Design a protein with these regions (language model features):
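Helix-loop-helix "hairpin" substructures at the membrane interface of multi-pass membrane proteins
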Residues: 73-151, 175, 180
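Transmembrane alpha-helical segments in multi-pass inner-membrane proteins
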Residues: 136, 146-211
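Alpha-helical transmembrane segments within multi-pass membrane transporters and channels
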Residues: 1-30, 189
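Hydrophobic core segments of alpha-helical transmembrane domains in multi-pass membrane transport
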Residues: 28-32, 81-92, 132-140, 164-170, ...
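Membrane-interface helix caps of multi-pass small-molecule transporters
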Residues: 3, 7-11, 33-37, 93-97, ...
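Cytoplasmic-side transmembrane-helix entry/capping segments in multi-pass membrane proteins
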Residues: 14-23, 46, 103, 155-157
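Transmembrane helix-bundle core of multi-pass membrane transporters
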Residues: 30-96, 202-206, 232-244
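Cytosolic-side transmembrane-helix boundaries in multi-pass membrane proteins
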Residues: 109-116, 122-123, 195-244
Length: 244
């Protein structure tokens, strides 16, 4: 999917926002189609369960339960959760401390200047988009194998993909901040589970909190107008070399 998006937006220079929305809808349909085919094949009606495989992804450190609340909170997660933190830390280091990362940031800020400096704009855009797509795929794998215990259900992801976009905005495009934002948004998202006696409407209102917080952050960031808190200047825009 990331390769299709890259080809359409980088090579053909189609509008990135429209392409993203179209592929999101397309991806949901493809997932439900193949999921429905597997349901028919296995004779199930609501979900496909891969509990044994899911349990492998949910395996936790054997000594986590012996460390009390700290162990249960931070050391009892599946390995994909820790892998996500490692990926964010490595990404932060690469973007801020390596030549490749600085070149990539230059492409995002001002591709014309980067192109004039000899940076291959197309290569960096393809590489970053494909890596981002792979990381997003790992997020989907985590949801199916760890969060839901290896069970596939049509439309089971709900709005969690949009929650990831909200986290990126809240973290002002900084991978290190995204780690803390993920914990905050995750806590807000499941807050209704730990508040007894809530009506269904109240639960939905609480589930809106991450998005409300994101809007507030956008307002504050736009008012302060600090350069370090702004998104990449060329975010969402196609690069036309002939206009350089």
């Amino acid at each position: 999917m990331a390769l299709i998006y890259s080809f359409l937006t980088i090579t053909l220079r189609v509008n990135q926002n429209v392409t993203g929305l179209a592929l999101t809808t397309f991806g949901i349909g493809v997932g439900n189609f193949f999921g429905g085919s597997l349901l028919s094949f296995f004779g199930e009606t609501g979900s496909i369960s891969l509990l044994k495989t899911g349990n492998c992804y949910k395996a936790k450190l054997p000594f986590a339960d012996n460390l009390g609340l700290f162990g249960k909170t931070f050391l009892s997660l599946g390995f994909l959760a820790y892998l996500a933190i490692i990926i964010a830390l490595v990404t932060s280091y690469v973007l801020n401390r390596t030549r490749t990362g600085l070149n990539l940031r230059a492409v995002g800020e001002n591709p014309a200047t980067a192109d004039a400096a000899g940076i291959n704009i197309t290569k960096y855009k393809y590489l970053s988009t494909l890596i981002g797509g792979a990381v997003a795929g790992l997020g989907g794998l985590y949801f199916v194998m760890d969060y839901t215990g290896g069970a596939w259900t049509n439309n089971g992801f709900g709005d969690r993909g949009w929650l990831a976009i909200a986290i990126v905005i809240f973290a002002v495009w900084k991978p290190g901040m995204a780690i803390l934002s993920s914990f905050l948004f995750g806590g807000l998202y499941i807050l209704c589970v730990y508040i007894p006696g809530l009506s269904s409407s109240a639960k939905e209102l609480i589930n809106m909190l991450p998005y409300v917080v994101t809007i507030l952050v956008l307002v504050v960031v736009s008012m302060r107008k600090k350069r370090e808190n702004q998104p990449p200047a060329h975010l969402g825009l196609s690069y036309f070399r002939e206009d350089r």
